[in-house]
Structure formats: structure tokens, C-alpha cells
Amino acid sequence: MINNDILRRLSNMFNFNAEKIQAVFALNQCEITSAELDCILKEHDDPDYQELTDVQLASFLNGLIVEKRGKQDGPDRLPEQELSNNIIFNKIKIALALKADEVIAVLELAGLVLGKYELSAYFRNVNNKHYKRCTDEVLSSFISGLKIKYQA
């Protein structure tokens, strides 16, 4: 999925305005100006469109974890330099403190049926033989299911 779309969909789901989005970024020591955010939230075909980098999205997701679960002791988590759908999926799951059964229920709201074993493969280490790459379809379904759950 495109990082800008993920940010836009999550922000809409939680009814975050521009100031709140900037505040979530700041929770992970990432400063985004209002002008930058305006360009990031524009549609792809807009000439002022600016691509959200993996580091920026990782910072937002780390900030979302702090926003939803509170700050933990120790140093702030450094944002990943490269993101995969698996990492994004896991960070959203952590931010919302969702257990496997809850994630499965959220996916079912979006019309995607997965078993616990299948789901756990997305959260394994990339070097694990049972690791499974998360597709755009699965991540999109998860975000769609969350929107249904949280806006119902």
C-alpha cells in the first residue's frame, strides 16, 4: 500500500485533524510542518503531492502506539528505515492492543477470513520458515475492518 493512503485512512478512522496528526508524529520526535502535511495528504495526481517516506510513516505509527497505549519507560523507539506491510500491520495491532481473535474479527468485518495460524504467520520474524508476507489486500482489509469497528 502507499504510505500516504495508510496515513490518510488511519487519520480519517480516528477523526484526527491536521494538528492531531502533527502531534502524533511529534510523539516519536518527528516534526512535520503544516505545509508538508498538506502536501502529504493531497491526492496522487495533485501537482503539490509529496510522498510520505517509510521513516515518516514509521514515526507516525510509533507515535500512534504512544498515543493509544501511553509512553513506555526507556528511550523512544527509533523509526524503521524500511517498512513492510507486515511491520505496518503489527504496529497498528500493537497500538490498538488487539489480540489474535480480535484481529480475526476485524478482518471478517471486511470480508476476509483467516485462521489463527495463518494470522500468526504475518507477525513472525522474516527469517522464520512459517513467515508469510502481508499483501496489500490483507493490510487494506484490516484497515477497512478497523474503520467499520471504530466508526460503528
Task: Kindly give the residue locations of the regions a language model identified.
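Short, structured motif recognition centered on aromatic/hydrophobic residues
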Residues: I6-S11, A18-F25, D54-L64, I88-K93, ...
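Helix-boundary capping/turn motifs
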Residues: N12-F14, T33, L96
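Short, flexible segments with low predicted structural confidence
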Residues: R8-R9, E31, F60, G74-D76
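A cross-kingdom feature marking solvent-exposed beta-strand/loop segments within repeated
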Residues: M1-R8, N17-L52, L112-D136
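N-terminal flexible/basic segments that precede or flank functional cores
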Residues: C39-P75
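Short, solvent-exposed interaction modules
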Residues: N62-V113
